[in-house]
Amino acid sequence: TRTEPAAPQGGEKVRTNNIAMIVPQRFITLDLPFLRKCMGGICIMADQRGYDLMLCYASNTEYSQLQRQLANHKVDGVILTYAMADDPCIELLRQYETPFVLIGRSEDKTIPQADNDQVAAACEMTRILLQLGAKRIALLVGSTIYAVNTDRIRGYLRGFAEFGVPVDQRLVHSGVESAGQTLDALEAALEQKADCILCGDDEVAFEVMGELRTRHILVPNDLRVASLYDSSMLASITLSVSAVQYDAEQLGKTA
């Protein structure tokens, strides 16, 4: 005779052996090496512990997929691959009392976090570029609703402050989330006589390098380009871009 598993008693939860990895909705159409490597690290550790990985897309306004997974008890835990101000997903996870960890930095120290020091990295890169002779460094980063981008701006400003050089705020461009916005920010930076473009990540740097080639602007002879995240995407096109290196796979394993 076949014995059916007993139903959970009271508030007891049924173990699913599934972990959800939440990815920002806007990343669906992007090929981001950071996320791929991070996912690889998560998969390795999940497999070692007998868990499977489920993907879940969410944004600050759309999180129905996560809500459905939680309501139907599909996952035992969740990994958020980004840190965002006032993230509704965090409140939802707390309502369902689901364990979760954040890849990124949050001011809420009750949230388990795995992160790289973005402020220190951006500060150090800015100082190095200033030491190399750059004077007008334009910064191109994504939306400041994400902590990683506010941290990169803070590090950039700190780098100038530590070097004793004033910052031209016209060279700071945030909200760069698409190829079109990248080209607009680059155009504005060139109009402001930037001698270096510091990109928030490899995707922005890739777009910048492509446009500079189109304009026959030589890197680094005519203009320096640097990125606050390195990847195979950049290595495949040029060796002339200075970039910060992080071990995204290890970050995923830690989470």
Residue ranges and their predicted role:
Residues A46-Y57, L157-T182:
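Short beta-strand elements in bilobed, periplasmic/extracellular small-molecule ligand-binding domains
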Residues K135-I137, V167-L171, V219-V225:
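Short acidic capping loops at alpha-helix termini that bridge into adjacent secondary structure
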Residues Y57, G104, V141, L171-S174, ...:
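Residue-level recognition of beta-strand->loop/alpha-helix junctions
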Residues L183-A255:
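Flexible loop/turn connectors
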Residues I19-I22, A138, L198, A226:
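Short, well-ordered beta-strand segments
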Residues A114-L139, R154, R158-E162, S178-E187, ...:
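Hydrophobic alpha-helical segments within soluble ligand-binding/sensing domains
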Residues V14-R127, Q131, E187-Q192, E203:
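Alpha-helical recognition/docking segments in bacterial nutrient-uptake
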Residues T1-N17:
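N-terminal helix-turn-helix DNA-binding module of bacterial transcription factors
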